[in-house]
Regions:
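Trp- and acidic/polar-enriched beta-sheet ligand-binding modules for extracellular glycan
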Residues: 414, 442-448, 469-528
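Catalytic-core regions of glycoside hydrolase
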Residues: 1-144, 155, 160, 173-176, ...
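Disordered, acidic Ser/Thr/Pro-rich linker "stalks" and the adjacent N-terminal cap
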Residues: 397-457, 468-473, 493-502
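Mature N-terminal, pre-catalytic/accessory segment of carbohydrate-active enzymes
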Residues: 209-408
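Short edge beta-strand/loop segments characteristic of extracellular beta-sandwich folds
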Residues: 464-466
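C-terminal functional modules
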Residues: 165-203
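Core-facing hydrophobic residues within beta-strands of well-ordered domains
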Residues: 96, 458-460, 474, 515
Length: 528
């Protein structure tokens, strides 16, 4: 027998490894659960544990990817990191015996699983561009240049990071404040539009229709995040009319999401519950009650009343049916309370986790009859897509940015320091066309940088950089351009101590300058 030991938190400890004996390779295998995000195999210290040597004191181990905590719906993953880190571990390690997937749930982000399974057959770093060329053709059964361009944008946004994307729809309403997204949602919407361009060519593919649904689900989530920030703004301003408008738009997002989820059978509440019923039918009534109740409790209360405050909504889903009967209903309750407060200052009834437990439990014990039939037809998918683009678009036209080639283009940064607010920290705020948000790249000593990909080469006439302006702040930085992202030309530098203003610093280029990439490197800040 072989003991499979999970590397998690402070485990395995030094004493545990010693206790496994001198010939551990014969009967012990360590699963490095967070090999992608926080590997332990190449460290001698994690949690409270200090080891004698790396690779778990020279014990055989498996590189693992832990995804989809709680089965929560979110488009995320790190394609380039997977393609790099697994071969790098093979090259460096002496005791790596394979790769593994330790997801808490599946049915989302199929691309990351396709990639990691391909990595089992090579010890070389995968070229993501080439891999995506093959993937699009293999997945959709036909090649589309627009679809391939869409996947470039997906790789630069949702598949450039791990961890659930911020969401508000399935969150406990009382716990939600202003929320920010870790990438530019307009780029995701652009990817979706590109994917739709060859709909007639690709729509016979079930995988293509699934991908459209998954992107639509993420798009409506991103729209709801932005829209709820608008709700907060109106409420805090005491503007009743605007509050009602923004509230209606926010609540409509639940209807659109419910419609989207109804296109995939595995995204139906009726299918989730129905699978438990299918299993339970072979047993007695008590088993039926237990299995179906557990299926419903798992995705709502997670546990019984005694644990109501421990992990509420840990395994939340946004299944069709649940979106309206649970999530929209509880948001309507709170927003109606706030609307009444704006009208006549009626006290707001605040719910705690105990209130929400009982709200959920009523649903668990008296669940409506939900359908198990999804409409995944191309005609219906296209109709849903048009409604989404019509009612939940995040594309904004900002006239004052006419001629701004960099606005909302793909951007990468050396580092992102999230401020926790709705407009600070992430690189996407560096080129969103407004001075109300900003990018934070960390200490200037690290020479933080950002690179904007304009999509194609342009003859650039000038570059304007607006650093954060407040009080006596001033920054120094260098600006470079490149056609290929490899060879860079310095076009200007701010080296003085002039205090920053909202006009920023403009570098005018007199000679013809063709460039696709623009890079800004911070070299000094007078702020500690």
């Amino acid at each position: 027998a072989v003991w499979m030991v999970q590397a998690w938190w402070s485990n395995p400890t030094n004493d545990l490894l010693k206790g496994m004996g001198e010939y551990r390779q014969d009967h012990v295998m360590i699963l490095d659960l967070t090999g992608l995000e926080a590997p332990k195999w190449n460290s001698t210290a994690y949690g409270d544990t200090v080891l004698e040597s790396a690779e778990f004191n020279g014990t055989d181990w498996v590189w693992c990817m832990l995804e989809n905590y709680g089965g929560n719906p979110s488009m995320d993953g790190q394609l380039a990191k997977i393609a790099h880190d697994i071969p790098a571990a093979y090259q460096e390690a002496q005791h790596m015996k394979g790769i593994g997937i330790i997801s808490e749930a599946t049915y989302d982000n199929p691309v990351i699983y396709d990639l990691i399974f391909d990595m089992a057959w090579t010890e070389e770093t995968q070229d993501i561009d080439g891999w995506l060329d093959d993937y699009v053709l293999r997945r959709y059964g036909a090649y589309s240049m627009s679809a391939r361009e869409a996947w470039d944008l997906l790789e630069q946004t949702v598949y450039h990071r791990s961890g659930n994307t911020a969401q508000v729809m399935a969150a406990l309403p009382e716990n939600v404040g202003r929320t920010s997204l870790p990438y530019n949602p307009q780029l995701l919407e652009r990817a979706f539009e590109l994917l739709l361009e060859d709909f007639d060519l690709l729509s016979a593919s079930e995988a293509y229709r699934y991908d459209l649904t998954e992107i639509m689900r993420q798009m409506v989530n991103n729209y709801a995040v932005r829209q709820y920030n608008n709700v907060i703004d109106a409420y805090e301003a005491g503007d009743l009319e605007t509050f009602r408008i923004e509230k209606a738009k926010f609540l409509n997002a639940f209807d659109v999401c419910d419609l989207i989820q109804g296109t995939q059978q595995d995204q139906l509440a009726g299918e989730w519950i129905g699978k438990a019923e299918d299993w339970a039918i072979r047993y007695d009534d008590f088993a039926w009650d237990c299995l179906t109740m557990n299926a419903k409790a798992l995705i709502t209360t997670w546990a019984g009343a005694a644990s109501a405050s421990a992990l509420p909504d840990y395994a939340y889903r946004n299944y069709q049916g649940m979106m309206i009967d649970l999530y929209k209903a509880r948001w309507e309750r709170l927003l109606d309370e706030r609307e009444r407060y704006l009208i006549d200052q009626d006290p707001i009834e605040t719910w705690n986790q105990g209130n929400y437990f009982h709200f959920y439990w009523q649903w668990v014990m008296n669940t409506p009859e939900y359908t198990r039939k999804a409409d995944n037809s191309p005609v219906h998918i296209y109709e849903v897509a048009q409604r989404l683009l019509s009612e939940c678009s995040v594309i904004e036209e900002l006239p004052e940015n006419e001629g701004n080639l960099a606005m909302n283009k793909p951007i990468e940064a050396s580092r992102e320091v999230n401020s926790g607010g709705s407009g600070g920290g992430y690189a996407m705020y560096a080129n969103d066309g407004t001075l109300d948000s900003y990018w934070d790249g960390g200490p200037w000593e690290e020479r933080p940088w950002i690179i904007v990909n304009l999509g194609r080469s342009y003859d650039i006439g000038s570059v304007q950089v607006c650093a954060y302006a407040s009080g006596s702040r001033y920054y120094q930085f260098e600006v470079y351009v490149s056609e290929d992202g490899e060879e860079w030309t310095l076009i200007g530098a701010k080296e003085d101590e002039a205090v920053e203003t909202n006009e920023g610093t403009t570098f005018t280029i007199s000679a013809p300058c063709m460039a696709r990439y623009v890079r800004v490197i911070g070299t000094f800040s007078n702020q500690i």
